[in-house]
A protein has these predicted regions:
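Substrate-binding pocket helix/loop in short-chain dehydrogenase/reductase
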Residues: 102-103, 107-115, 213
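Short, small/polar-rich loop/turn modules that mediate ligand/substrate recognition or access, typified
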Residues: 92, 179, 184, 243-245
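C-terminal substrate-recognition "lid" of short-chain dehydrogenase/reductases
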Residues: 221-250, 255
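Conserved glycine-rich cofactor-binding loop
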Residues: 11, 16-19
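Alpha-helical segment proximal to the catalytic Tyr-Lys
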Residues: 131, 176-180, 241
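Active-site helix of classical SDR
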Residues: 126, 163, 171
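Active-site loop-to-helix junction immediately N-terminal to the catalytic Tyr of the SDR YXXXK motif
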Residues: 106, 153-161, 173, 198-201
Length: 292
């Protein structure tokens, strides 16, 4: 589908690039000739991913940085270290946090836990890279991973929907503001793409697994991670420089059909939601144990 050396000489940073869709995109960039930097909160996971990918693609470099992108000073320090080695040519804002909950049960801390990653962290990353590209007169590309909720909203994931919508507006705003500097900003809005980390918090009861998404999707299935990786490679390529300020859905037309991702949960009882909270708390505890 792509030239084997499409990204030869390029260096991209993928936030949340150690697992799931972030890893899939990073691997695709490396496959096509790029060197990559991945960051996240679990240093051990990042290092293991980097080793595996570099073993698979000899001669390519995957650098890791353990960082909490919610902390602006930590982001600035990381970007400074990355730049000291070699400037970046692109950024993929993939890091996110989310879980399902009745909005009435959300505490301010729970809301901030999502908004600080998805909205604040994405801005910190984008601005830290953008100001350096502008100062150096370097062309670059930013790609943010959103969701179709930015157009429709979604029940039970209000902090994420609000934050992702903010990133969509940031994408469109900076696409105009930074275009004269040769910096493009685009975004992908995926439908259901099952990954282990996200699905444990968004489908904790695992009732029917992803069947409920299949029956409500015109294509009759969920997304394949390779499809998202191919879309990311396309948008990061210099071959499509005229695409700027776009938010592109990749959801099998599920959004057009009018099926909100979590609308079926309207029938859940308070007991169902209690079990969901307990399962998510268990998943979060296991995740925290893996952080460096």
């Amino acid at each position: 589908m792509f030239k084997a050396d499409l990204f030869k000489g390029k260096r991209f940073l993928v936030t949340g690039g150690g697992t799931g869709l972030g890893r899939m995109m990073m691997e695709k960039f490396v496959e096509l000739g790029a060197d990559c930097v991945i960051c996240g909160r679990r240093g051990g996971v990042l290092e293991e991913t980097a080793k595996e990918v570099m073993a698979k693609y000899p001669g390519r470099r995957v650098e890791t940085h353990a960082v909490d992108i919610r902390v602006a000073t930590a982001v600035e320090e990381m970007i400074e270290k990355i730049w000291a080695t070699r400037p970046l040519d692109g950024l993929v804002n993939n890091a996110a946090g989310n879980f399902i909950s009745q909005t009435k049960d959300l505490s301010p801390r729970a809301f901030d836990a999502i908004a600080n990653i998805v909205l604040h962290g994405t801005f910190y990353m984008t601005n830290a890279c953008g100001k350096r590209w502008i100062a150096e007169k370097r062309k670059a590309s930013v790609l943010s991973i959103l969701t179709t909720w930015v157009w429709t909203g979604s029940p039970f994931v209000v902090p994420s929907a609000m934050s992702k919508a903010g990133v969509a507006v940031m994408t469109q705003s900076l696409a105009v503001e930074w275009a004269r500097h040769g910096i493009r900003l685009n975004a992908i809005a995926p439908g259901p793409f099952p990954t282990e980390g996200a699905w444990a918090r968004l489908n904790p009861m695992k009732e029917g697994d992803d069947d409920r998404y299949k029956v409500r999707n015109p294509l009759g299935r969920v997304g394949r991670p390779s499809e998202l990786a191919n879309m990311a490679a396309f948008l990061m390529s210099d071959e499509v420089e005229y695409i700027n300020g776009e938010v592109i859905a990749i959801d099998g037309a599920m959004g057009i059909m009018g099926n909100g991702t979590f609308s079926s949960m309207m029938a859940y009882s308070d007991d169902d939601w209690r079990r969901i909270r307990e399962q998510i708390q268990s998943t979060n505890a296991a995740d925290r144990a893996k952080r460096s």
